[in-house]
């Protein structure tokens, strides 16, 4: 099918999902430099928070270099055209965090739950709509639910007031057919005016292919990150996605050369390590494990002598989901004892 002339809103993840490989320690200067570069390149929507969303600063998830208020307060006044979004996970972020973000000028709030737990989003979605925000329901780890199951969860979020629903491949585990199956079912079930989004990870190198597959079945919001900066092997690399969309005639409004320069000149030099598909990131995608578990597993591996790959496979076998970061160390300790590495 031809996608020529199809309009898509590209949503940047560099400054939120990209906080995971940065251990949430981006400086305000880095944040504002990248945000202004993205704005100048024509990116219409930029997410800014702790990697785990508003209120994510904690022992469990990691302490950031600055508060959410400081990051948002630094970026929002500098935006000429782009709007700023924030992620919120119920149980981590609160309604008070939501109101704070709105007061600072956040345009879009994305309320994220595990793909079987949309019912915990009601309070936050209802409040966001009451505050007249662009309100997104964000269903994480979508490979862990069937198309029919995702439809039920999406319709719940829509009933609470979400005007856009995201199907989110947090583990980078889905292949294009799995993306199409899930998103086409959700698209058919939602009201025509409710938007549909897709968030991909590149652990199996499928970020761009999956995003195009999502667009083919009706997604009109697509997440990506400059130079792919994000959890695991990163998000869908934005500069590649924009180039592919340009070749296909999909209209994003983002300048290919400018977004490539942002990736190459601003994001790559800031990386603490290359964002690539190493054996552990590949394991995330292969075993279907939550992307931000990667660094936790690497740290546990260094501490207890169990290969990170083995820890990740075990987490996948146990069906661990986002929010269970504290279980990674427990799992590593158990495995180390079983292998005689700990007394």
UniProtKB/Swiss-Prot annotation:
A UniProt-annotated Pfam family: HMGL-like
Signal peptide: none
Catalytic residue positions: 20
Catalytic activity: (S)-4-hydroxy-2-oxopentanoate = acetaldehyde + pyruvate
Database matches in SUPFAM superfamilies: Aldolase, post-HMGL domain-like
Class of enzymatic activity (EC top level): lyase
Domain Pyruvate carboxyltransferase: 8-260
Keyword annotations: Aromatic hydrocarbons catabolism, Lyase, Manganese, Metal-binding
TM region positions: none
Site entry: Transition state stabilizer: 16
Gene Ontology biological process terms in this record: catabolic process; L-leucine biosynthetic process
Molecular function terms from GO: 2-isopropylmalate synthase activity; 4-hydroxy-2-oxovalerate aldolase activity; manganese ion binding
Enzyme Commission number(s) from the entry: 4.1.3.39
Source species, domain of life: Bacteria
Residues annotated for Mn(2+) binding in this entry: 17, 199, 201
Similarity field: Belongs to the 4-hydroxy-2-oxovalerate aldolase family.
UniProt protein name: 4-hydroxy-2-oxovalerate aldolase 4
Organism (species): Dechloromonas aromatica (strain RCB)
Organismal lineage: Bacteria, Pseudomonadati, Pseudomonadota, Betaproteobacteria, Rhodocyclales
